[in-house]
Every structure is written in structure tokens, then in C-alpha cells.
């Protein structure tokens, strides 16, 4: 809280807050009560990409899509958001979260024109509803999700006996989550407990930064935390992340180990588009195929900019569509000689 206390003491005039705990518990006190410091949330329309737990499907353990889907069903995001994040996040759902590139519902006719020529390489489910992350909001529940997970694991050849989930050879289901920071341990703890209910042991390994980078560059891990950033116009970065030729290139960004000719074809289509509409269609088709592969367990994102500022700062009534709050404040805010008027004018300042 040192930065927050310095802000309250007047050492600077504006704060963008990333930490949910700080936002919920730190921005309180007399100066907030009397209005000399203001606290607000502004809509965040920036592309979010997808932060997630990513499977390394180079590992035979994760080769079966049913296994990956089952493990994803064990993460109770809604519980995490309530108990750990002060209900301040939204679940991410797409590799292009918060953009027009995110697939929704059934494939559109334009998407089908791209997917049909690839049908022999695609799971038939790709032509159905695009999967959304599982949730535990009523009428759904963790119990139901774990029941579904057990069924998927059984279909994939895993059975529970002698205190663990085991394959046909009797080997227990164990994997390691490689981390570079202990920050993630408290988040992994409830997830690991849920996996234990399935008979799966998830071990957490925290290493120093240099060893972490070496292991990730060498693809020496079962699962990692990563954030694939995205933009409103995806392009060349997709080749390093998801194309087959990047899967065996040490130090590349294909952390999943994905080698899928259908994915390669869709990325090549994205790189060849000539119009915005074609880009949206091809990106949605790619997103659809990736999400049906259950290669990641999606995390969460912040759909607002959490900001606090000193009374007397003026700001434009109209928000930009896409912005980082710190840059916007430096570029467009000002000291106002009539802060009362500015405050009254900006109450409804969210972009239409």
C-alpha cells in the first residue's frame, strides 16, 4: 500500500490501479469521503487476448482433448472471483476477448465457407456452438462440472483406483504447473483441490526467472501461465503462436505445441485478407477452431480502468474507444479552475 499512501499524501495526482485487493481496500479514508480524492471506473474496450493456464500438448498426458476439457471443468472461476478477486474481473472466453474477432454461437455462413474445405481435418463439434468457459453460477455447479469431468476422463481411459486417477498401465495422473512467481500459488490452490477430487495431482513448481525462461524456451513444462495479447487487427503474431512450424522452434511462442493443418490454413487466410470484414470472418473461424481444441483454461480480464485522481483535474467528456488510462491522462487531462463544474459534467461521461 506504499504507493497508495504516497498518493493520499499528495505526492502525485493520479493512480491507475491494477490490483483488485488494493482497489477494494486501499482507496478509502477522509480524503475520499470529503471529495478531495475521487475514485471511478471507466469502461475498458481494449482488446484483451487471453491469459490462461496453457497445456503443453507435446506431453502425451495432454494429447486427448477430453482430458484437457476435463481439467478445465475443475477450475471454479466464480468462486475465485468472489473469494480472491473481490468480484472485480470478467471471465475471458476467446483468444480475441473483447474484440469483434471473437467467435460467437454457430458459425456464420461466411465462416462456414472457410471451415467446410477443412472439414476432414476438423472435429465435427467445430460446426456447432463455440464453447464458452464452464461456470458454477446456478443452475450450474462445481459438482456437476466435476461429474462431467469424470465422464470425459473415463472416456479417455482414466479410472480411479488405489487413491488416484490412473491410466490402463496403472500410472497416476500427475502434472506440474511451472511458475516464475509465487503470486499464482494462492490461485492454483483451490484449482488443485478440485483436481484432487478427480484423483489428479497438480504440483506447483516455482523457479527463478532465468530457469523459468530456459525451461519455457525448451518447452520443458506441462502447464504454464501465459497471456497472449491481441489487437483489433490480428496478423503475423499468430504464425509464431499457433502455426505448426513454430511448434518445434525453440524459444518461439507456440507454447501449446500446436501442429494443426487446419489452424495453419486459417492463419494463412488471415494474412491474405484484403478487407476488414474478411479479417473478422477468418479470425472468428480460427478462434472457433482453437477454442474447440481446449488448449487453455481461460483466466479473466478487467473490463474497466480503475482510476483515482485529485479533485481539480479536468478530463474530456467523451472517452476514446481504446486507450491506456495513464497515457490518456497525460495527453488529454488538465488542471481545471472550476472542478465543481467538471465533476457535474463528467458524471455521464462513459462512451456511448
Q: Would you name each region that the model predicts?
A:
Residues 161, 171-176, 193-207, 265, ...:
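A local structural motif
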Residues 1-5, 204-214:
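Short helix-initiation/N-cap motifs at beta->coil->alpha
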Residues 123-131, 166-179:
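Short, conserved helix/loop micro-motifs enriched in His/Cys and acidic residues
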Residues 65, 146-176:
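Immediate post-signal peptide segment of exported/extracytoplasmic ligand-binding proteins
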Residues 73-132, 147-150, 182-193, 214-352:
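Detector for C-terminal structural segments
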Residues 40, 51, 171-181, 202-205, ...:
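Short, well-ordered beta-strand elements
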Residues 71, 138-139, 143, 183-200, ...:
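Cysteine-centered nucleophilic/redox motifs
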Residues 1-59, 66, 70, 75-95, ...:
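Extracellular/periplasmic solute-recognition and catalytic clefts
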Amino acid at each position: 500500500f506504499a504507493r497508495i499512501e504516497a498518493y493520499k499524501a499528495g505526492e502525485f495526482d493520479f493512480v491507475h490501479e491494477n490490483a483488485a485487493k488494493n482497489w477494494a481496500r486501499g482507496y478509502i479514508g477522509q480524503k475520499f469521503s470529503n471529495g478531495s480524492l475521487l475514485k471511478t471506473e471507466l469502461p475498458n474496450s481494449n482488446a484483451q487476448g487471453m491469459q490462461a493456464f496453457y497445456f503443453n500438448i507435446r506431453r502425451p498426458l495432454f494429447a486427448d482433448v477430453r482430458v484437457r476439457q476435463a481439467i478445465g471443468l475443475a477450475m471454479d472461476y466464480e468462486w475465485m472471483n468472489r473469494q480472491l478477486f473481490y468480484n472485480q474481473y470478467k471471465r475471458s472466453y476467446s483468444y480475441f476477448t473483447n474484440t469483434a474477432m471473437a467467435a460467437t454461437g454457430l458459425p456464420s455462413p461466411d465462416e462456414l465457407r472457410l471451415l467446410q474445405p477443412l472439414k476432414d481435418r476438423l472435429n465435427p463439434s467445430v460446426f456447432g456452438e463455440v464453447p464458452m468457459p464452464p461456470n458454477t453460477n446456478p443452475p450450474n455447479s462445481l459438482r456437476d462440472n466435476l461429474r462431467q469431468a469424470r465422464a470425459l476422463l473415463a472416456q479417455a481411459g482414466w479410472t480411479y483406483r488405489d487413491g488416484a486417477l490412473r491410466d490402463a498401465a496403472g500410472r497416476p495422473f500427475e502434472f506440474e504447473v511451472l511458475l516464475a512467481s509465487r503470486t499464482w500459488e494462492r490461485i492454483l490452490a483451490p484449482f488443485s483441490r478440485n483436481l484432487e477430487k478427480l484423483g489428479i495431482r497438480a504440483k506447483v513448481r516455482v523457479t527463478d526467472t532465468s530457469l523459468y525462461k530456459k525451461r519455457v524456451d525448451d518447452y520443458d513444462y506441462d502447464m504454464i501461465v501465459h497471456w497472449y495479447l491481441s489487437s483489433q487487427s490480428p496478423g503475423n503474431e499468430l504464425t509464431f503462436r499457433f502455426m505448426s512450424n513454430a511448434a518445434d522452434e525453440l524459444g518461439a511462442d507456440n507454447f501449446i505445441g500446436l501442429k494443426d493443418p487446419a489452424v495453419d490454413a486459417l492463419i494463412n487466410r488471415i494474412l491474405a485478407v484484403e478487407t476488414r470484414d474478411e479479417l473478422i470472418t477468418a479470425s472468428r473461424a480460427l478462434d472457433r477452431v482453437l477454442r474447440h481444441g481446449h488448449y487453455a483454461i481461460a483466466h479473466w480480464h478487467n473490463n474497466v480502468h480503475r482510476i483515482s485522481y485529485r479533485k481539480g483535474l479536468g478530463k474530456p467528456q467523451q472517452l476514446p474507444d481504446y486507450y491506456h488510462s495513464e497515457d490518456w491522462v497525460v495527453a488529454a487531462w488538465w488542471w481545471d479552475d472550476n472542478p465543481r463544474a467538471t465533476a457535474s459534467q463528467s458524471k455521464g461521461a462513459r462512451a456511448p
